[in-house]
Amino acid sequence: MSCRVYPLLGLLLASALSPVLAAPATDPTSLLRDVRQAYGGAQWNHALALQADGKETGDDLSGPWQMLVDLRSGQFVSRMRNDVFSAAEGTDEQGRWREDITGLVHPLDSDEAHTVGVTENWLRRFGFLDAHSPVSYRALPDVQEKGHTWQRIEATPAGGRSVTLWIDPATHRLDRATWPSSFLVVTQHYGDYRDVNGLQLPFRIETSSANLAGNSDGSSVDVVEHYKVLDAAPTTELRRPDGKVRDVTMANGARTATTRLRVEGGIVLVDVSIDGRPPMPFILDTGGHAILTSDAAKLLGFETKGNGVSGGSGSGTMSTSYTKVHDTALGDAHVHDLTYTVLPYPFGFYERGDGEPIAGILGLEMFERFAITFDYDRDELRLSPYDQGEAPAAVKGDAVALRFTDDMPLVTAQQDGHAGTFGIDTGNAGYVLTFPQWAGSNGISSRYAAGLPIPTGGVGGLFIAHVAHAQQLVLGQQRLDNVVAMLTREDAGATGNPSEAGNIGQDILSRFNVHFDYRRQQMVLMPRATTPEWHYGMVGFRAEKEQDHADRFDVINVMPGSPAQLAGLKQGDAIVAANGKPAAKLSFGTLRDMSAHLPEGTPLSLKLADGRVLEMRARDMAPR
């Protein structure tokens, strides 16, 4: 495990320990001996598996929960359901897997998923009670937290991630465990220990995660009603669900469905009909899930349940709730009874001037049900269903293998001669993202850190990043030398992920026609009818609309030395027209198309609310 994790953990833990007083470290061998005795000692020799049944509460929703664990291998399955959705996850002989809240399964098979999975499986099977488990221990100084002393051990299972165990010296039982997982830090608290057949087992397990800025990314509480100690390891019960699609129908006997696709300011929009209503624009995002904006959910008359949080690009989070949609249709493809998350996106996210507002996002659940082709030449999206007779045919082209740490597909690509794991994110409307931890470890961060400062962000809020021309990007067999990359920040949430190299979005993907086939775990890049020219000229500002004055864009950032600044544009100015088109009729995306990714010298005229008219010409400002 890289030593860089320790200061990150320290940042998070420091805020929780008030005050913190370090004491000499306790010898781990003697401490673990006491722990093993406190948990039941030799009684564990006769336990081969555990089954826990109870209730899970999360996002203000509750329902039955069950977990089955093989205490020797660490294989497990955990299932929950509530009034809105069900979900499951596990490890079987094939590896880690997850069943999402829409009922379909995908593997968690990246290097990061494997590393984290080894440690989580070790914890789940109480691996610290196994004196023969292949794990290294390191004593950490005792700490005091709110008047209570905790003994701590850092444990690193073979092939796994280091985890800090917090032990109560009065009971010699585990109070909590903390470990990094992707861009989050996970904390699991154990309490309400009781005797079960001579074993001391926790009847309350609280799991929470936070990003590196310390903002919550969700939590759940599992309350065990009863345990079963099994003297035989389960096999069939631990296997993942078959993953067969049972909730899709194709109208008119269609084998393939087609719907309109367009790209607006780098944002991929597709037409989607909800419960038979006229089609509305949705973002199709491999890094996303089925989401309705709060405004769309209200307009469509959906009731919501639950109250959670969601993170993303940036360090902040957003509140969430849930609803069920009877029919989601993309052309002739219909998905029935799909669970949607409802998010209170701001007006500037969904407003499209004189166009229909963006109603939401579709993501993982579509790619699990269909092989999907983004045909940018024809401005259409094609969907071929799984498990409807003959499987979708393989597509010819440059096939790139996909893997998963979470729900976004990952590929191996190269930037500036260095290989790394990159997210494939059709919802990324901007530049290639380069994550600072990976860039630093490969010696290329200074090149980008000296680049143009530029505002960016998403669900987690805005932050300043830096852009520069990359030397080269290699994706599959494609070598691209006209690419601008953006160096993000370590505290940028999912876009500052220490386990990945970066994120590839529309700036690269739309240079090809792209086919996704999750059953084959591949993305296929196919040549466009005409090779598109790519430009990085910009005028250098960012502006957003507010609902109470939708007839103008408020300028929130002007880049130093940019054509916009030289023309006299300032933060706080209000744009009422661009190239003669009223701002009321323009979306964020269309204004972006008029002000960025342009050939150098492209003119832009901005009329401001104070009567000024500013003339400027696009310039490629990213250093080479």
What would you call each of these model-derived segments?
Residues 56, 140-143, 193:
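Short, solvent-exposed loop/turn elements at beta->coil junctions and helix N-caps
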Residues 23-33, 95-163, 169-171, 180-181, ...:
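Flexible, processing/modification-adjacent segments and terminal tails
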Residues 1-4:
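N-terminal secretory signal peptides that target proteins for export/translocation
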Residues 56, 80-82, 100-103, 155-158, ...:
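Beta-turn initiation residues at beta-strand->coil junctions
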